[in-house]
């Protein structure tokens, strides 16, 4: 399996989602849930006749100012094609009417936006306001309400323009918030995966970096598998795997398959979409060409012709023999890796399934291990790395265990 540069991190391209409005709500002992202030004006109230109202506060008031049992938890409400994120706070005290103060500073986004990056920010704002109320009665003091309005106005403007905000409330208190993109957890890195660096870590690394990272980095060359890197660096496989997942999370590397001449590849449906991009063509030609004199004659048309000649059932070894003359000036390993990374071609994996086992009792430990993997769920790369054997030897071992069929996916 390959994870492209444009793959699981795509959602960062839309970062940050636009903040449409902010409002501050609280529970009034006489009126119940009310909006104390909002920005822009009329976002959730009818102060301007409802012209700019995104959603009426009455429709969400029970969620924004909930029962005490639901306070101190992040809430998200989706209605009228908008989503509201808040973190209601309940402060218990005999100095308050009804012995409690409940308030919530909420943010509004379009419903389809991924607003996960704002959740930590909303929580922090809520906790800051809670501390300010406990220290200087920042919320319950009616004389300070205008200050809250100016605060939410500045937050709205600064977050949309700069993704961060610093507000000095007085000599001792301030609000400092900043947005950071939230990425999903990276795919689990397997022992047979081959990491390919996309950043020059040697320019970033210093003596304070994690020791395991410093050990494994020199062996990340686009050829070694994760298992092999762990062995060469003399670190545990689990530690090496964690390093690769961290690099993958921060976009420092991508994952590809082990390159072997028995591999099979085929074209994807994405290939025609890339033909009209001249920058892509230049990048491809520069990446897959060797330093030999023959490289001067390499064109993208030649490269694309080679990609088109890949098909189901054709091994890389046989593919090269069919196109001996065309391959002059090209690096086949880089040609395959570029094609898989960019989505031009995909790997056709080979999954062995043991249909009928030979009745033998004197199985070796390696054969017993292999027997447990012949269920059609483990492809050849995994078998070779697990057993530390070549594809040829693994094929011979499978043949010795009984009748097997191979599933190509």
UniProtKB/Swiss-Prot annotation:
Chief subcellular location: cytoplasm
Biological processes per GO annotation: negative regulation of TORC1 signaling; positive regulation of autophagy
Keyword annotations from UniProtKB, A to Z: Cytoplasm, Nucleus, Transcription, Transcription regulation
Record localization: Cytoplasm; Nucleus
InterPro entries: NPR2-like
Signal peptide: none
GO CC field: cytosol; GATOR1 complex; nucleus; vacuolar membrane
GO MF annotation list: GTPase activator activity
Family statement: Belongs to the NPR2 family.
Free-text function comment from the UniProt entry: Mediates inactivation of the TORC1 complex in response to amino acid starvation. Post-transcriptional regulator of nitrogen permeases.
Protein name (record): Nitrogen permease regulator 2 homolog
């Amino acid at each position: 399996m390959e994870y492209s540069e444009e793959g699981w991190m795509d959602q960062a391209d839309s970062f940050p989602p636009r903040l449409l409005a902010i409002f501050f709500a609280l529970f009034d002992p006489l009126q119940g849930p009310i909006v104390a202030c909002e920005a822009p004006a009329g976002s959730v109230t009818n102060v301007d006749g409802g012209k700019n109202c995104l959603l009426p506060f009455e429709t969400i008031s029970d969620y924004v100012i909930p029962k005490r049992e639901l306070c101190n938890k992040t809430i998200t409400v989706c209605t009228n094609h908008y989503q509201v994120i808040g973190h209601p706070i309940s402060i218990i005290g005999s100095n308050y009417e009804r012995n409690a103060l409940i308030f919530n500073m909420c943010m509004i986004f379009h419903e389809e936006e991924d607003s996960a990056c704002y959740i930590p920010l909303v929580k922090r704002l809520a906790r800051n306001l809670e501390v300010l109320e406990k220290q200087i009665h920042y919320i319950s003091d009616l004389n300070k309400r205008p200050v809250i309005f100016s605060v939410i106005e500045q937050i709205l403007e600064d977050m949309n323009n700069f993704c961060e905000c610093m507000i000095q409330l007085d000599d001792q208190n301030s609000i400092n918030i900043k947005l950071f993109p939230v990425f999903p957890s990276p795919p689990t890195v397997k022992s047979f995966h081959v990491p390919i660096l996309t950043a020059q870590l040697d320019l970033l690394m210093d003596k304070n970096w994690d020791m395991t990272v410093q050990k494994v980095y020199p062996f990340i060359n686009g050829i070694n598998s994760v298992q092999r890197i762990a062995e060469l660096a003399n670190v545990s496989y689990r530690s090496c795997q964690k390093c690769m997942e961290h690099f993958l999370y921060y976009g420092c590397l991508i994952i590809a398959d082990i390159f072997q001449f028995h591999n099979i590849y085929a074209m994807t449906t994405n290939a025609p979409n890339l033909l009209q991009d001249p920058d892509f063509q230049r990048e491809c030609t520069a990446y897959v060409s060797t330093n030999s004199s023959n490289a001067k004659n390499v064109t993208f048309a030649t490269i694309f012709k080679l990609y088109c000649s890949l098909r189901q059932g054709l091994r890389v070894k046989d593919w090269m023999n069919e196109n001996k003359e065309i391959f002059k000036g090209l690096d086949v390993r880089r040609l395959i890796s570029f094609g898989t990374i960019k989505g031009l071609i995909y790997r056709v994996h080979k999954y062995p399934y043991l249909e009928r086992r030979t009745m033998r009792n004197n199985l070796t430990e390696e054969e017993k291990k292999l027997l447990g993997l012949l269920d059609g769920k483990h492809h050849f790369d995994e078998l070779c790395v697990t057993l530390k054997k070549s594809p040829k030897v693994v094929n011979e071992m499978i043949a010795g265990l009984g009748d097997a069929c191979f599933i190509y996916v």
